[in-house]
Amino acid sequence: MSSGQIVQIIGAVIDVEFPRDTVPKVYDALKVEGGATTLEVQQQLGDGIVRTIAMGSTEGLRRGLQVENTNAPISVPVGTQTLGRIMDVLGNPIDEKGPIGEEERMPIHRTAPGYADQSSSRDLLETGIKVIDLVCPFAKGGKVGLFGGAGVGKTVNMMELINNIAKEHSGLSVFAGVGERTREGNDFYYEMEESKVLDKVAMVYGQMNEPPGNRLRVALTGLTMAEKFRDEGRDVLLFVDNIYRYTLAGTEVSALLGRMPSAVGYQPTLAEEMGVLQERITSTKVGSITSVQAVYVPADDLTDPSPATTFSHLDATVVLSRDIAAKGIYPAIDPLDSTSRQLDPLVIGQEHYDVARGVQTVLQRYKELKDIIAILGMDELSEEDKQIVSRARKIERFLSQPFHVAEVFTGSPGKYVSLKDTIRGFKGILDGEFDHLPEQAFYMVGGIDEAVEKAKKTK
């Protein structure tokens, strides 16, 4: 083991000098004297000096402290022992339940599977959320992004997806909390415990209050655990909340590493950093990783470099809209903005495709008519347009749904709606079968039968 000493500390970035013949490799993990702090090598500056990022607080460190090179990247526990446990970026348990007791550790930096080993899946993953199953269906082994500004419901939607899929899917899940609120991590843990699925979930947290090094690497820690399950031939779910914070952590240390900022102050290596992470989240011929990633959209601007870079890696994008949330329609998913590569008649079948496109056509026409209605009122519309407006308003309300994880807020029990019922309900509205029902009957219900029952009660 070679050793060096700290020569400079600027925030989370630390320069360490080693003898010239024993300079550590990039991504090697270094241990500071006392063993409490781990550093990861980012750059070799020449003259035996390496620039590192601290995985933890740099308080109490000073120049001259001895640093040992471990001659290996950061490695974390993998395998079934991680299930039901909460770990930090280095794989240390933070749930006060004692050591993990792992049989194997793996480095967090690995290469993505080769082209020959990758496989794409065409099987649909039913989520039980009407709007998602209808207009932006998920693929098993696909990548999904939940895009939204502050407070439109990304985390609640993710919790509901975990609740529905983890229970129905009965496979293994890995949850990576990247720079999010500790309270949400806490809520998630107890939610899983209550749902009796805690023994199928491994949790890795690098929360908001942690240094940028932790937030930058915690996504890779979670991904490494998911890759191990995949390579054992399992189908894994990987949840990441929030990908934007991963980018932000990179931005925080980028300037300290001496890089010139690029557009909007982001790091110049933004696309590469995102690519390194996303290319590893993939399915192989052995097993699959289905990932759901929450993506914060700064100032509701989808053209911001961070969400824009994420878009290109995803199979399905679920866009949450503030306008829809303002109407009180939850989940506030925009059916016109959300897309999926699976929305193809060859994959989902002709009926599903026709209904989904029909719903989008009616909603788009209603959007166009809104200006006319605002100026001239409903009476000036043709009979055909009046009918479109009426059906669009019913569809809008029918896209809402009570969530299991939001029962405490709404007071109504959550509903899981099968894909068959979803298609039947929307097809009925489009065909005019329910033109006689009041639009309020469609608000916050599960299947169409429930809407019919609700209409009878309100009469």
From Swiss-Prot:
It is an enzyme of class 7 (translocase). It is found in: Cell inner membrane. Its EC number is 7.1.2.2. The keyword Membrane applies. Pfam families: ATP-synt_ab, ATP-synt_ab_N, ATP-synt_VA_C. NCBIfam families: atpD. PANTHER family: ATP SYNTHASE, ATP SYNTHASE SUBUNIT BETA, MITOCHONDRIAL. Produces ATP from ADP in the presence of a proton gradient across the membrane. The catalytic sites are hosted primarily by the beta subunits. F-type ATPases have 2 components, CF(1) - the catalytic core - and CF(0) - the membrane proton channel. CF(1) has five subunits: alpha(3), beta(3), gamma(1), delta(1), epsilon(1). CF(0) has three main subunits: a(1), b(2) and c(9-12). The alpha and beta chains form an alternating ring which encloses part of the gamma chain. CF(1) is attached to CF(0) by a central stalk formed by the gamma and epsilon chains, while a peripheral stalk is formed by the delta and b chains. Belongs to the ATPase alpha/beta chains family. This is ATP synthase subunit beta. The gene is atpD.
